[in-house]
């Protein structure tokens, strides 16, 4: 599409500016703050000739909503979140700057390894096997241009692709004096990395943006899914490969309670930290047995097996605070005391159940029950107690029972066809290891949604994060063409 190619250089400059903006969850900014992530997205969309508004979510956190109005009640939603996780230790990044937006290269080394080159720096790192498959099957060149920095891949490259697509669609409709047979809505949402408050405010209730604009009240199929609205959830991915499902997640906090005593007389106390260590070791060593206890409540055929990450955070005793400026710095007291409390977290990912989607709560409850039962049956407790509480949960998402069935869905079929035209190969279908905002769009808004879609890159939530520049531009073309396929032209 010529309208995309003509903006290729400009969108790269916009993307650099977005990467330079810190945008923590809940602190993405507001449209009237030109230096914030939200302010920059709003300003980038404003010249398109679309209708651009903001939607308050938190005190310093707004969704940006861009609308290209067409004819009729149908809608196609392009959703991309604007927040990014913290950078961690800044000294580990090239030149100590996680927000440099520096230009560079990624080189595929084979064996799930890449080298990231930025200036005089070269870093080697692992990538997901799904991304290695793209390099191995479809790429002859082993080096690709990148932009470097926290949030580049997850998720500012996606935001740039959406901006590029919306601008191209608006320009093409104006130049050709045509209208689409429905409305394209680009939702640049906040807080995906934490609670999902942005997507909920935009899509999930009658008083959400979609609800108040009438898009949630249209016809539905026999499973309750809307038939006049469809969507894609943009998130750092594998180069416009349609993701058709992801596992559910449940995050647990385990608290152990012991008895305090002076460290000089440890026999008079019960150490809650060593008690927690017993639980962590038991669950780590027994992960397969925990999954077996869940048994028939899981159907891993599409989304893969259950996994447990035990001890994702831990604190206890006299720990008061942890400061993360460079190397971690722990503020503590009571080093000379036996700790009477300890808390650790567990992140569990699990596939759908045999009666999905009607059994999503039952499946999650079976997973939590299996963890409790395993601790009760394997960890010897003497003088200490524990409790488990659920912090957060997200249901699994599966667009269909199998890859074959998902490939036959019109939304997925059209995306693969358009990606094939732009990329030179028709991508396979994949599932994602983690969650996206599509969870809420599918389970709450009941909108058919490609679960994850986006440009290639790597190392999200890690140091040396990068996004491939050409993939951002290719995405603008794919999204614009897909919007035309979904809505058609007005007669």
Tell where the protein language model's regions lie, with residue ranges.
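Intrinsically disordered, low-complexity Ser/Thr- and acidic-rich flexible linkers and loops
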Residues: 108-128, 211-223, 320-333, 357-361
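Metal-dependent amide/peptide-bond hydrolase catalytic core
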Residues: 1-8, 23, 27, 36, ...
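Acidic/histidine-rich catalytic neighborhood of metal-dependent amide-processing enzymes
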Residues: 139-245, 491
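Short glycine-aspartate micro-motif
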Residues: 75-77, 147, 227-233, 251-253, ...
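A structural signal for isolated positions on well-ordered beta-strands in alpha/beta enzyme cores
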Residues: 53, 77, 185-187, 387
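Acidic/His- and Gly-rich active-site-bordering loop/insert found
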Residues: 1-152, 171-180
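Short, glycine/charged-enriched secondary-structure capping and boundary segments
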Residues: 91-95, 163, 200-203, 246-248, ...
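Short acidic loop-to-helix transition motifs that present clustered carboxylates
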Residues: 58-63, 195, 238-239, 434-437
């Amino acid at each position: 599409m010529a309208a995309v190619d003509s903006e290729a250089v400009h969108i790269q400059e916009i993307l650099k500016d977005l990467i330079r903006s810190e945008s923590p969850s809940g602190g993405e900014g507001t449209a009237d703050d030109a230096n914030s992530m939200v302010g920059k997205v709003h300003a980038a969309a404003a010249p398109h000739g679309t209708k651009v508004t903001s939607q308050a979510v938190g005190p310093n956190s707004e969704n940006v909503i861009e609308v290209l109005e067409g004819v009729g009640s149908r809608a196609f939603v392009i959703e991309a979140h604007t927040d990014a996780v913290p950078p961690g230790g800044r000294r580990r990044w090239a030149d100590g700057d996680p927000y440099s937006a520096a230009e560079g290269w990624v080189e595929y080394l084979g064996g799930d390894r890449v080298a990231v080159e930025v200036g005089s720096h070269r870093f080697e790192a692992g990538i997901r096997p799904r991304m290695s498959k793209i390099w191995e099957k479809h790429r002859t060149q082993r080096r690709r241009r990148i932009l470097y920095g926290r949030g580049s891949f997850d998720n500012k490259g996606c935001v740039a692709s959406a901006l590029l697509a919306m601008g191209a669609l608006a320009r093409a409709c104006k130049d050709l004096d045509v209208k689409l047979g429905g409305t394209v809505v680009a939702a640049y949402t906040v807080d995906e990395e934490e609670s999902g408050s942005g997507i909920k405010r935009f899509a999930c209730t009658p008083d959400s943006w979609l609800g108040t604009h009438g898009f949630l009240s249209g016809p539905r199929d026999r499973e309750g899914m809307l038939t006049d609205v469809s969507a894609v959830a943009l998130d750092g991915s594998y180069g416009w490969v349609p993701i058709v499902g992801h596992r559910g997640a449940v995050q647990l906090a385990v608290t152990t309670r012991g008895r305090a005593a002076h460290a000089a007389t440890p026999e008079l106390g019960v150490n809650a930290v060593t008690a927690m260590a017993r639980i962590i070791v038991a669950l780590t060593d027994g992960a397969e047995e925990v999954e077996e206890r869940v048994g028939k409540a899981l159907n891993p055929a599409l989304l893969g097996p259950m996994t447990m990450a035990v001890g994702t955070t831990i604190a206890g005793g006299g720990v008061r605070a942890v400061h993360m400026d460079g190397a971690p710095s722990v503020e503590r007291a009571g080093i000379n005391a036996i700790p009477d409390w300890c808390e650790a977290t567990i992140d569990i990912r699990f596939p759908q159940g045999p009666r999905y989607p009607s059994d999503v709560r039952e499946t999650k409850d079976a997973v939590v029950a299996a963890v409790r039962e395993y601790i009760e049956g394997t960890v010897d407790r003497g003088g200490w107690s524990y409790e488990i509480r659920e912090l957060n949960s997200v249901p699994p998402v599966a667009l269909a029972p199998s890859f074959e069935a998902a490939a036959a869905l019109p939304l997925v079929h059209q995306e693969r066809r358009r990606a094939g035209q732009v990329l030179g190969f028709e991508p396979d279908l994949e599932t994602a290891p983690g969650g996206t905002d599509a969870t809420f769009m599918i389970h709450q808004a009941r909108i058919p949604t490609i679960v994850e879609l986006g440009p290639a890159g790597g190392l999200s939530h890690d140091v040396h994060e990068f996004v491939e520049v050409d993939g951002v531009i290719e995405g603008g073309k794919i999204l614009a063409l897909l919007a035309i396929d979904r809505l058609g032209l007005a007669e």
